[in-house]
Amino acid sequence: MDLFEYEGRTYFITVDYYSRWVEIKLLTTQTAKSVITAAKELFSTHGIPDIVISDNGPCFSALLFKEFAAKYGILHTTSSPRYPRANGEVERAVRTVKGLLKKNDDPYLALLSYKLVSHQVSYSWEEDSELSSLSLQRHWHPET
């Protein structure tokens, strides 16, 4: 987890270390409360992680954030201020996203193009399925 600024806007970014999936949310403030709200939205979609790594920023070192992590059963680890590479996945994602934002006027289109291109899966599960993609999309399964 990290926060970064681009053109006067503050973004909350998270990276799943296993899949390298990136999630970004625009924040109105850099408070622990706004970070917790963004994290809760993320967790409601992807589940609660076992471990969260962040820097020692004020929003992550605040008592409110520590209480949130404890309540949700999250081990919160911080990277060393002198060694930010300890949170390298997020730092690399920040550089990538900033580069995309520079190339596109609409930040949402930039982020969408990043997700569509960089996270395509080459394996097609439909090839192994006897059901059509339409029946799978509609959650309808024929009787056997």
Task: Locate predicted features.
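Retroviral integrase
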Residues: M1-V97, Q120-T144
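Short, charged, surface-exposed loops that flank catalytic or proteolytic processing sites
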Residues: L101-A110
